[in-house]
Amino acid sequence: MKHIPSSRELGYTIIRIALGIVLVVSGYNKLSYALTQNTEHLIQIGSTMGLFGFSSGYLWWGYLAAFTEFFGGIAYILEFLVRLVSLPLICLFIVAIKFHIQKGDPFSVWGFAFICLSICIGVLIAGKGDDKKLEEMK
C-alpha cells in the first residue's frame, strides 16, 4: 500500500529541508571563502569559543562550525541521521546565540539563530518523522 504523507508530516519535511538548504549554503559560503580568499573569517567565527574558556585553535573551531553547517544541512535534506546531526547543530546555535547576547546585540540580530536552534531541537525530538512501517501495520 502506498504511503500518503499527512499534512503534519509534509509540513515537518518542508521545515527540515528548508533549514537544510540554509545550512548548506551558509556552510558552503564559509568554506569557499576560506579556501579561495583567506581564513580570517573562520578564525573570527572560531574565536567565539573563547566565551567557553578556549584560548586557542580558533581556525579549527571555525572549520568545525562551517563543516557542521554544511554536512548537517546535507543530512537534514537527505533525512540521514537527523537526530545525531541535530546535536552538533544545537551546540553551534547555542554558541552563536551566546556570542550575540554577550555582545549586546538585539534579538533582531540573533533571532534567526534562535529559530534555527528551535527547529534543531524539534528535529532532535521528532527524528525522521512518522514511521511509515508502523502506520502500515495499523
Residue map of PLM features:
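Membrane-interface interhelical connector segments
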Residues: 32-57
